[in-house]
Amino acid sequence: MAGLVDLKNEEEVKEYLDNLGTEYSYQCLKEKQPDGCNRLAEYLENIKKNFESAAQILKINCDQNEHSESCYKLGAYYVTGKGGLPVDLKAAYGCFLKSCNKGGKKSIDSCHNVGLLSHDGRVNDDKPDALKARDYYNKACDGNFAASCFNLSAIYLQGAPGIPKDMNMALHFSEKACSLGHMWGCANASRMYKLGDGVAKNDEKAESLKNKARDLHRMQQERTQQISFGE
């Protein structure tokens, strides 16, 4: 069919990819399109493997345009020192914060990362900020990010500066994490129901949640084995 690239034709594929790069460069550098700049950064990273150039485009697109996906990716670069950037958790935090507040495909992931970095304390002179962590975990959990829901349950299970221990909230977020496929959310909720730990004891719910945790663990092991076999 006309217009389709013959993937078996190496020259045709190369020409197609080169044309993509030209198109994205024009969108970004000439037309100043934020989405075009994000596409150019992805092209440089995934096709050209030019991480240094990708980092520079991401930086421009995040700093000047506050493009949510570019800010998320730039934050990830700062976390690992990719693309010639320094490892800089404070810079990463700023990028994730922009992405979280802006909204977009990666905003929920970014909100979770803001929560993690606030909880960890390394972006605040080794002073964990449990209140800020809770607020951003809440945003991510509202977007059905399972790990944020689980981290909220852990905060309420133990209590933290400014956040009193609350077993009902701990159970609520454990069960939500479980419903989103988080094995340890299921395990913690099961334990709370089994022991009656701050909530009404319920052996039936405890058993059901324990079985779900086992199922999730088995599925996780199967996925790991499949990845290993596929290497």
From Swiss-Prot:
User: Would you identify the family this protein belongs to, as annotated?
Assistant: Belongs to the hcp beta-lactamase family.
Q: Which UniProt keywords apply?
A: Mitochondrion, Repeat
**Listed name of the protein:** Cytochrome c oxidase assembly factor 7
The cross-references to InterPro entries, in alphabetical order and at most eight, read: HcpB-like, Sel1-like, TPR-like_helical_dom_sf
Function field: May be required for assembly of mitochondrial respiratory chain complexes.
Q: What is this protein's gene name?
A: coa7
Principal place where this protein is found?
mitochondrion
Compartments (UniProt record): Mitochondrion intermembrane space
